[in-house]
């Protein structure tokens, strides 16, 4: 008899006792004694209680209750069910989630709605002189809640004057203002200013160039693009395409060096800083778009994932949910075009009233110095970041800091243990989720290596399935009836999250088919709909989930999602390459997978490592650049003419297995050089820098 059946029988037994008017506490006492003390001790105590019954008199329960207690002992297992010991933590976390959900829905149901902007304005009025943002590095400085609010109001009035009525700016489909920023504070002012007007904003990766950047701008549906002046070259490369689509472009400066591009600096300086009426946001609902964050996904070029006002508020509460308070100082080196840096970090501090320290980029030599200088108590991470910190030489002051909490995702168990052993008992708050996904997981009890914890109670609120999958097709396997096949405990399975009213999937801005590709139907029964995360997880008996792999055409390197389609598109522009197949391969001691490309040369052409190096450096960000090239005579394809990757991924760049010519990216030589056995050994040992 399974545990579920045993629990059902026990529940019926308790209901029967309650119906007969008998106490049920003897059953609970008997089970507790058995689980805590074991069978022998429990039997001795119950036997003594029966022998002492004549002297205990009225305190002894009725015979029916005693009989029920004895029956309960035979029904349930001798040991406590594995997940039951986490029941108090599960209940507390579920209560917090429900409370936050009801509070957020209530705020957005008001008229005008109470959005994240309203929460920020309340903080600015309550503590105008408190430092909100502190930035490090060249030009270090800070801005208070009051100062940022005033500058955001100036941005709102300047944009309203420059672009017209916000109602027309956001008419029809949600129209975003795009921010292509390399400097945090001016971009944040523009974002908050547009939010005060009720308009969503799209944040674009400033490292993009050429076709991927143009695609990102055009796919947003935005009519306005605001650019930092130091990204002039990137803008001018795509400006003709933007002008053909009547997209207005502005620099965040007082002058414009580019014909056809305006400058907002003077208008921002001249704009008033008085409050923006909340009535301008009256049309917002909990379903309204608040942000567009670009994600590589698994189906091609970057797509603008829609973050609704409800979703933004939920994500911004993660710091509060982890136990952070207004007294904390949060440190982040994560980019603002990512959810973790912008929503969890910046908005989380806006919500809490805490101070956020922004570093321009990650530096192992500056990380702990910054933390000590600014009294940092909370750090945000991706798994790769903490591994880099563990790899630097040990210092006497490694534990001389005030950091008590680290929040992020993608932390491996070995790095988790090493990090805490070296830098002290810092509590790890590991979370899991995707920008466009409809469900997240939180490791709220701190189990090392787990990306999240799922109780039976929480699963009723956020249903999901782990199912068998076809690695090559990157899709679920179905049984004879056409339904997906669940995996057992401890077995790797593709994570599918159910789309229900309290867990909707909003998807991407653009054609509906972009979002439909992420949905799987008829998973457990006819008519149900699930979101395909593309991630392979395994769940143990206690409800902890562990990451196993990532399916599809995306892999993760240096904390960034890399779209193989995007990289293939860039490489295909090289004249001596006829066909390109990009994939990620594992490197010993490194998080994620590094990019590798199997290529077929065009007829009569030879491989030019220097030319390829110059091309990828010009058109791809560093994290998306393939580090290994494999030259094949012919590409393997499936019956539907899809390029096959499984064998290529398995063989990787192992010179002892691969017979095809292999090349490695050499930054010193500024070329792709033939990969030798010595170079391969250096990569595996970590002495060759990737």
Curated annotation (Swiss-Prot):
Predominantly expressed in liver. It is found in: Endoplasmic reticulum membrane; Microsome; Cell membrane. AMP binds at residues 292-303. GO terms for cellular component: basal plasma membrane; endoplasmic reticulum; endoplasmic reticulum membrane; plasma membrane; protein-containing complex. InterPro entries: AMP-bd_C, AMP-bd_C_sf, AMP-binding_CS, AMP-dep_synth/lig_dom, ANL_N_sf. Its main location: endoplasmic reticulum. 3-alpha,7-alpha,12-alpha-trihydroxy-5-beta-cholestanate (THCA) inhibits the activation of cholate. The keyword Magnesium does not apply. The chain crosses the membrane at residues 31-51, 56-76. The keyword Transmembrane helix applies. Residues 1-30, 77-690 are cytoplasmic. Its EC number is 6.2.1.7, 6.2.1.3, 6.2.1.-. It catalyses: a fatty acid(in) = a fatty acid(out); cholate + ATP + CoA = choloyl-CoA + AMP + diphosphate; chenodeoxycholate + ATP + CoA = chenodeoxycholoyl-CoA + AMP + diphosphate; deoxycholate + ATP + CoA = deoxycholoyl-CoA + AMP + diphosphate. It is a multi-pass membrane protein. The modification Phosphoserine is found at residue 501. It holds the Pfam family AMP-binding_C. It is an enzyme of class 6 (ligase). Gene3D superfamilies: 3.30.300.30, N-terminal domain of ligase-like. GO terms for biological process: bile acid and bile salt transport; bile acid biosynthetic process; bile acid metabolic process; establishment of localization in cell; ketone body biosynthetic process; long-chain fatty acid import across plasma membrane; long-chain fatty acid import into cell; long-chain fatty acid metabolic process. Belongs to the ATP-dependent AMP-binding enzyme family. May mediate the import of long-chain fatty acids (LCFA) by facilitating their transport across cell membranes. Also catalyzes the ATP-dependent formation of fatty acyl-CoA using LCFA and very-long-chain fatty acids (VLCFA) as substrates. Mainly functions as a bile acyl-CoA synthetase catalyzing the activation of bile acids via ATP-dependent formation of bile acid CoA thioesters which is necessary for their subsequent conjugation with glycine or taurine. PANTHER family: LONG-CHAIN FATTY ACID TRANSPORT PROTEIN, LONG-CHAIN FATTY ACID TRANSPORT PROTEIN 5. This is Long-chain fatty acid transport protein 5. It comes from Homo sapiens (Human). The gene is SLC27A5.
């Amino acid at each position: 008899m399974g545990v579920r059946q045993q629990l059902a029988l026990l529940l019926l037994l308790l209901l029967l006792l309650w119906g007969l008017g008998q106490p049920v506490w003897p059953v609970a006492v008997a089970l507790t004694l058995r689980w805590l003390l074991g069978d022998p001790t429990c039997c001795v105590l119950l036997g003594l209680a029966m022998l002492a019954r004549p002297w205990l008199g009225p305190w002894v329960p009725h015979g029916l209750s005693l009989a029920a207690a004895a029956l309960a002992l035979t029904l349930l297992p001798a040991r406590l069910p594995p997940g039951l010991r986490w029941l108090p933590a599960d209940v507390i976390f579920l209560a917090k989630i429900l409370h936050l959900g009801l509070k957020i829905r209530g705020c957005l149901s008001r008229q005008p709605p109470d959005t994240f902007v309203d929460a920020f304005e309340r903080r600015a009025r309550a503590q105008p002189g408190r430092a909100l943002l502190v930035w490090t590095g060249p030009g270090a400085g800070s801005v208070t809640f009051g100062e940022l609010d005033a500058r955001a109001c100036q941005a709102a009035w300047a944009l309203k004057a420059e672009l017209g009525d916000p109602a027309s700016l956001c008419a029809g489909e949600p129209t975003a203002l795009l921010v292509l920023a390399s400097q945090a504070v001016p971009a944040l002012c523009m974002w908050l200013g547009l939010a005060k007007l009720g308009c969503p904003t799209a944040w674009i990766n400033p490292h993009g160039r050429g076709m991927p950047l143009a695609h990102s701008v055009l796919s947003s549906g935005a009519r306005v693009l605001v650019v930092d002046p130091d990204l002039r070259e990137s803008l001018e490369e795509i400006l003709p395409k933007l002008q053909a689509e009547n997209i207005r472009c502005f620099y965040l400066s007082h002058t414009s060096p580019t014909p056809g591009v305006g400058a907002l600096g003077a208008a921002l300086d001249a704009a008033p800083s008085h409050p923006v009426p909340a009535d301008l946001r009256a049309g917002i609902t909990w379903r309204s778009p608040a942000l567009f964050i670009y994600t590589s996904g698994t189906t091609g070029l970057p797509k603008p994932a829609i973050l609704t006002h409800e979703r933004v508020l939920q994500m911004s509460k993660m710091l509060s949910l982890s136990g952070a308070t207004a007294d904390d100082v949060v440190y982040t080196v994560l980019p603002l075009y990512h959810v973790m840096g912008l929503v969890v970090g910046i908005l989380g501090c806006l919500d809490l009233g805490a101070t956020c320290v922004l570093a321009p980029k990650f530096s192992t030599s500056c990380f702990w110095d910054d933390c000590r200088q600014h009294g940092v108590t909370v750090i945000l991470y991706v798994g790769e970041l903490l591994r880099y910190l563990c790899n630097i030489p040990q210092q006497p002051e490694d534990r001389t800091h005030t950091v008590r909490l680290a929040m992020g995702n993608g932390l491996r168990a070995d790095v988790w243990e090493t990090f805490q052993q070296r830098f002290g008992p810092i509590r790890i708050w590991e979370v899991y989720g995707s920008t466009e996904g409809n469900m997240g997981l939180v490791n709220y009890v701190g189990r090392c290596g787990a990306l999240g914890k799922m109780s039976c109670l929480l699963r009723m609120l956020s249903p999901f399935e782990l199912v068998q999958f076809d690695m090559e097709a990157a899709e679920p396997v179905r049984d004879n009836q056409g339904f997906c096949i669940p995996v057992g405990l401890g077995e790797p399975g593709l994570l599918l999250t159910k789309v229900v009213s309290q867990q909707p999937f909003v998807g991407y801005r653009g054609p509906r088919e972009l979002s439909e590709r992420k949905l799987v139907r008829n998973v457990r029964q006819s008519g149900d709909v699930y979101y395909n995360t593309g991630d392979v997880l395994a769940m143990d008996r206690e409800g902890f989930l562990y990451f196993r792999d990532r399916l599809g055409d995306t892999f993760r390197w240096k904390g960034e999602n890399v779209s193989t389609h995007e990289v293939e598109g860039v490489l295909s522009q090289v004249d001596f390459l006829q066909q390109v197949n990009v994939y990620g391969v594992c490197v010993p001691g490194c998080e994620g997978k590094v990019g590798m490309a199997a290529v077929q040369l065009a007829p009569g052409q030879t491989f030019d490592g220097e030319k390829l190096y110059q091309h990828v450096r010009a058109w791809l960000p560093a994290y998306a650049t393939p580090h290994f090239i494999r030259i094949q005579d012919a590409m393997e394809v499936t019956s539907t003419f899809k390029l096959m990757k499984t064998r290529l991924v398995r063989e990787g760049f192992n010179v002892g297995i691969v017979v095809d010519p292999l090349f490695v990216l050499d930054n010193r030589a500024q070329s792709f050089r033939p990969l030798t056995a010595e170079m391969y050994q250096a990569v595996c040992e970590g002495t060759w820098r990737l």
